[in-house]
A protein has these predicted regions:
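Conserved ABC ATPase signature
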Residues: 89, 130-134
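Conserved ABC transporter NBD signature motif
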Residues: 57-67, 72-73
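A short, proline-enriched helix->beta-strand linker immediately N-terminal to the Walker B motif
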Residues: 149-153, 182
Length: 238
């Protein structure tokens, strides 16, 4: 699968959130989208999830314009927004069952997948508690689980590691790398360590402009493999 972003620009009133972004995101590896807060990453994610339209440019999934034919991506999309909402009066199981019904996932398959996801994210023992009793990190894990329901072929996750402890971050990283073998996985983050051992390709965005796109080795070719140092160099030169 190929997700193509072609000269995408997004304007909000007098503010340009994105300026002529061109990227190609393929299945087979995690694509990391990095940049500081406010760089335009979440805006691009929302465009790809067809929650907002670009002011100019197009996005295509295997050659199909997703702005003109949004179902081309919606039917295969798993999306975790930066501020994922959950229903506080529901338990984790109830919430995930509700999301699976919205995605038209077979009930028996959904039950198995929900149990597996709760186990992966160490939530099984809390699955009957209301989400209002969960910590922020626990709710984030539920949100990630919701994005993974239905075995999406395009997975877009925006700042997924927020609130996760180190072990949970490792589990998430390993899961994303496994999933990316057969699908598109786009990971947006401002934390370089999130993509350091995860991404096979990455792009750096700052102030709505694309500063770099390529492999991690290309990104760090002038810093002896040090990704944090390379990131700081790009930010300083900017």
């Amino acid at each position: 699968m190929l997700l193509s972003i072609k000269n995408v620009t997004k304007n909000y009133s007098q503010v340009q959130a994105l300026a002529g972004i061109n990227l190609e995101i393929r299945s087979g590896g995690v694509f990391g989208l990095v940049g500081p807060n406010g760089a335009g990453k979440s805006t691009l994610m929302k465009i790809l999830a067809t929650l907002t339209a670009p002011t100019d440019g197009t996005c295509e999934l295997d050659g199909v314009n997703i702005q003109k034919q949004p179902n081309a991506i919606r039917r295969v999309l798993g999306y975790l927004p930066q501020d994922a909402a959950v229903y506080p009066n529901l338990t984790a199981v109830e919430f995930l069952e509700y999301i699976s019904s919205l995605k038209s996932v077979d009930a028996r398959a959904a039950k198995r997948q929900i149990n597996d996801l709760l186990e992966i994210f160490n939530l099984s023992q809390y699955k009957k508690r209301r989400l209002s009793d969960y910590s922020g990190g626990m709710r984030q894990r539920v949100g990630i689980s919701a994005a993974l329901l239905g075995d999406p072929q395009v997975l877009i996750v925006d700042e997924p590691s927020v609130g996760l402890d180190p072990v949970e971050r490792i589990n998430l990283r390993n899961l994303l790398m496994q999933l990316a073998k057969e699908r598109i996985v786009l990971l947006s983050t401002h934390i370089i360590s999130d993509i350091e051992q995860t991404a096979t390709e990455l792009a750096l965005i700052q102030k709505g402009r694309l500063l770099f796109s390529g492999s991690p080795s290309e990104f760090t070719q002038n810093t002896a493999g040090d990704m944090e140092k390379a990131y700081l160099q790009y930010m300083t030169n900017e």
